Amino acid sequence: MYKRQVLDSVPSTKEAEELTNLAKKENLNADVFGPLAFDNSISKKSAEIKGIKNVVAGDADVLLVPNVEAGNALVKIMVYFMGACAAGVVVGGKVPIVITSRSDVATARLASIAAAVVALD
């Protein structure tokens, strides 16, 4: 049986556990589970091998990272090694803010604008 690795020495694991517990408490209309390593988040086979039984394991729609550096690295890996199109939007203020990289292609810039428009609703 898989036991989530929540370690005092790794603050992001404690934060992931707190988010999981908060999601349960607030009865969100979403499945939230963590901490999960990247492979267990995106690979059902990896999660299965490690005995992780959760609907999120291997089928995550959203990945949360512990800091901006980790998030930036993850996005760049997905863009440059996996051919992903990244869109960036900051929400929570009066209006959404479009975030782009200086090296973004036109498709990524347009995707960010489209995501901001959707966030307006």
Question: Which residues make up each language-model segment?
Answer:
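Conserved strand-to-helix beginnings and helix N-cap segments that scaffold or border functional pockets
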Residues: S9-T13, V75, R109-L110
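General beta-strand structural signal in soluble alpha/beta enzymes
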Residues: D31-P35, P66, V91, I99
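Short active-site-adjacent structural elements
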Residues: S41-I42, G71-K76, A106-A108
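C-terminal functional extensions of proteins
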Residues: I77, A84-D121
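Active-site rim loops that border cofactor/substrate pockets in soluble metabolic enzymes
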Residues: L7-D61
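Short, small-residue-biased leader/transition segments that mark boundaries at the very start
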Residues: M1-Y2
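Structural signal for hydrophobic packing residues in well-ordered secondary-structure cores
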Residues: T20-N27, M82, A116-L120
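A C-terminal functional module that forms or caps the active site or interfaces directly
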Residues: A47-G93
